């Protein structure tokens, strides 16, 4: 069992190269993630066990609580479909990896919005730190529950 942690911080890193795909890395405290998945799905997720049941539970949870939207010249709030790649455990945290299919259709968009409600269903003081990198330009912000959305203009 892990020691009590007095912080409730998740990190999202989005890499967006024009004409290529989106790569997303999410870092969450493992115990909180397991509790959140159980509360939302009644499934006991074990981050240390890489099996199909855990993959389905984690993928479903992330897809319900984390979304990326882009907009630009002629398009408004297009949700970027993200595919679950996998996860790994690092000490008391779990890293989750997602990516989009080819982003060749997203060349002219210059606005990105990220909705991040991960762990909001179990923690009242959850903080999300969000970093977005586009073509080498990094922008960062944070949201504190009950807020859940951050936007960047490029």
What does each model-found stretch correspond to?
Residues 3-154:
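N-terminal soluble domains immediately following signal/targeting peptides that reside
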